[in-house]
C-alpha cells in the first residue's frame, strides 16, 4: 500500500509553558493562548483582522483541545466541542535547548542531549580570535555589529554604514547561532554565502549550531528589507534520521519546502523547494500535496510565524498569519489522497506577548489526520521524537531509538 506523509510545521507555535519552562525563564509563556486572549479582547485588531482568533480547520484537527490539555485552559474564543476530525496530542521537548535545530532534529529521531555553544555577551559577543580568523580567511577588512540583535532592527541601524564600508554585519541571539547580514546586490549574494561557509568551518568545532546568511536590499534605513535568499549552514545531525531510514528501507522521496533542508544540513533530503513568503510556502506545499508521487514525505517549515511575528513581538501580525494559514489548510485537507497522513506541529514557542524577543520553552501541538484515524486525545508526549516514531510506524519502517508511536487506526485493537 503506497502512503505519503505531509508535515506542516508552524515555526514557534507553542501552546503553553512546559514543565521545565522555569529553567529557561519562560514561566507564563503561551504563544497560542496569549495571542487568542489578545484577539478575544480586541487588542489584536488591525486593518487586516479583528475580533476573536478564527481557526476553524485547525480547531477541527484538535488545536484548541490540545492547548487545553497542555495549559489547562481553552484558548479564548475556541470551541469546547469542535467538529473534530483529527487525533491530537501535545509534546514536551527532551532536547537541552529551545532552538529550531533541536526541535526539528528531535522529531526525526535525534534529540540534542548535549549543550550547544553560545555567545552569551550582549555586546562584543564574539571572541576576538574568532573574528580575527574569519577576517584572515575571508580577507574582509572589517565588520559591524558584534552583538545580540534583532535581525530586522540591526539592518536598519547599520545598513547605511554597511553600504558605505561594505563591512558585513555580524550578530547573534540567545540561540546557538552566528548571523551575517549583507546587501544582496552591493556586497553580493555569492560573496555572502562564501563568507558564511568559511565562518561555519571556523565555528563548527565550538558546537555553534548554525551560521545564517541574511541578505537584504534597499538604499536607506526606511527601505532596507531582508530577501528570500536566506541560507542556513547547520551542523550535521549526530544520529540517523527518519529520512535516511525511509530512503534506505522504502526508497522514499523526502521533499523539503522552505528551510527544512538547511536545518537538517541536507541529510536525507531528495528534493528541495524554496519559497519567500508565507503565501509562497503555502502555494508550494499545496502543489506538492497535489503532485508528489506516492511513497513521499513532504515537510514544510512555515518560518514567518517565528521570524516575522514571534521575534518581532507582533501579536496582530501573528494572528493574521494564523488565520490566513487556516484558509490554506482547508485546501491541503481537500487535496489529501486516500492514504495520506497529515501532521501539524511546531518546534518551540516564541510568544509575541512575552518579555524579550527570544524563543520560549513551550509544549507544542501534535495534530494528526488520516481517514482511518479515530478522532481522539492521544495523550502527552515526553519527546518530540514521538512524531518521528509515529511516522516510522505508519510507513512500516524500523523503529527510531527515541519516541513512541501514538497512532491507532480504526479496526486495530
From Swiss-Prot:
Named cofactor requirement(s): Mn(2+)
InterPro entries, per the entry: Alkaline_phosphatase_core_sf, DeoB, Metalloenzyme, Phosphopentomutase_DeoB_cap_sf
Positions with a binding annotation for Mn(2+) 1: 11, 347-348
Cofactor note: Binds 2 manganese ions.
SUPFAM superfamilies according to UniProt: Alkaline phosphatase-like, DeoB insert domain-like
Gene Ontology MF terms: magnesium ion binding; manganese ion binding; phosphopentomutase activity
Function statement: Isomerase that catalyzes the conversion of deoxy-ribose 1-phosphate (dRib-1-P) and ribose 1-phosphate (Rib-1-P) to deoxy-ribose 5-phosphate (dRib-5-P) and ribose 5-phosphate (Rib-5-P), respectively.
Family: Belongs to the phosphopentomutase family.
Entry protein name: Phosphopentomutase
Amino acid at each position: 500500500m503506497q502512503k505519503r506523509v505531509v508535515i506542516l510545521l508552524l515555526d514557534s507555535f507553542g501552546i503553553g509553558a512546559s514543565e521545565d519552562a522555569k529553567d529557561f525563564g519562560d514561566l507564563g509563556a503561551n504563544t497560542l493562548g496569549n495571542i487568542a486572549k489578545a484577539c478575544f479582547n480586541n487588542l489584536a485588531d488591525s486593518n487586516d483582522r479583528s475580533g476573536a482568533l478564527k481557526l476553524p480547520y485547525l480547531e477541527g484537527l484538535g488545536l484548541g483541545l490540545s492547548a487545553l490539555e497542555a495549559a489547562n485552559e481553552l484558548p479564548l474564543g475556541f470551541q469546547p466541542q469542535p467538529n473534530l476530525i483529527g487525533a491530537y496530542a501535545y509534546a514536551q521537548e527532551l532536547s537541552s535547548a529551545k532552538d529550531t535545530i533541536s526541535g526539528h532534529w528531535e522529531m526525526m529521531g535525534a534529540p540534542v542531549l548535549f549543550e550547544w555553544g553560545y555567545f552569551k555577551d550582549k555586546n562584543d559577543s564574539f571572541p576576538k580570535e574568532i573574528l580575527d580568523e574569519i577576517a584572515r580567511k575571508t580577507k574582509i577588512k572589517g565588520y559591524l555589529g558584534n552583538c545580540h540583535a534583532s535581525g530586522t532592527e540591526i539592518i536598519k541601524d547599520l545598513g547605511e554604514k554597511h553600504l558605505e564600508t561594505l563591512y558585513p554585519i555580524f550578530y547573534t541571539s540567545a540561540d546557538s547561532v552566528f548571523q551575517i547580514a549583507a546587501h544582496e546586490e552591493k556586497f553580493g549574494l555569492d560573496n555572502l554565502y562564501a563568507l558564511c561557509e568559511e565562518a561555519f568551518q571556523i565555528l563548527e568545532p565550538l558546537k555553534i549550531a548554525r551560521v545564517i546568511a541574511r541578505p537584504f536590499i534597499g538604499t536607506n534605513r526606511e527601505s532596507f528589507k531582508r530577501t528570500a535568499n536566506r541560507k542556513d549552514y547547520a551542523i550535521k545531525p549526530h544520529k540517523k534520521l527518519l529520512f535516511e531510514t525511509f530512503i534506505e528501507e522504502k526508497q522514499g522521496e523526502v521533499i523539503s519546502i522552505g528551510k527544512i533542508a538547511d536545518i537538517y544540513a541536507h541529510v536525507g533530503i531528495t528534493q528541495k523547494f524554496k519559497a519567500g513568503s508565507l503565501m509562497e510556502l503555502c502555494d508550494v506545499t499545496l502543489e506538492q500535496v497535489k503532485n508528489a508521487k506516492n511513497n513521499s514525505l513532504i515537510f514544510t517549515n512555515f518560518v514567518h510565524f517565528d521570524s516575522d511575528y514571534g521575534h518581532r513581538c507582533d501579536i496582530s501580525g501573528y494572528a493574521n498569519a494564523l488565520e490566513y494559514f487556516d484558509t490554506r489548510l482547508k485546501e491541503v485537507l481537500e487535496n489529501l489522497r486516500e492514504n495520506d497522513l497529515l501532521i501539524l506541529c511546531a518546534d518551540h514557542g516564541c510568544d509575541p506577548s512575552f518579555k524579550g524577543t527570544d524563543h520560549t520553552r513551550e509544549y507544542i501541538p501534535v495534530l494528526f489526520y488520516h481517514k482511518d484515524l479515530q478522532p481522539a486525545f492521544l495523550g502527552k508526549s515526553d519527546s518530540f521524537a514521538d512524531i518521528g516514531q509515529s511516522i516510522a510506524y505508519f510507513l512500516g519502517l524500523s523503529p527510531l531509538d527515541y519516541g513512541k508511536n501514538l497512532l491507532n487506526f480504526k479496526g486495530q485493537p
